[in-house]
């Protein structure tokens, strides 16, 4: 069984046991989170497509890690002017493991 969920403005195709990184969620490591924004659920030849969500569909996941991605560095400069700017950014994420999918 698989599902397509929306989290943090992105869509993910997930199955039970999958480990994925989503935008930061307000949960502690070891807690269980539930994604109710299920767009599609499928198993074998049977597929349920939501309009826009599958009624009663939910995906449960366990939080494995709260961390930040590797640093993305941006440098801008103008030649011959002594103008240099350097900026770095690390986006926070939550790593989750899918524990259950319910079609509703």
Swiss-Prot record:
Record protein name field: Large ribosomal subunit protein bL21
GO molecular function: rRNA binding; structural constituent of ribosome
Region (Disordered): 81-104
One Gene Ontology cellular component: cytoplasm
Basic residues composition bias: residue spans: 81-90
Keyword terms of this UniProt record: Ribonucleoprotein, Ribosomal protein, RNA-binding, rRNA-binding
Subunit architecture: Part of the 50S ribosomal subunit. Contacts protein L20.
GO biological-process terms attached to the record: translation
InterPro entries, per database record: bL21-like, bL21-like_sf, Ribosomal_bL21
Pfam assignment, any one: Ribosomal_L21p
UniProt similarity note: Belongs to the bacterial ribosomal protein bL21 family.
Cited function: This protein binds to 23S rRNA in the presence of protein L20.
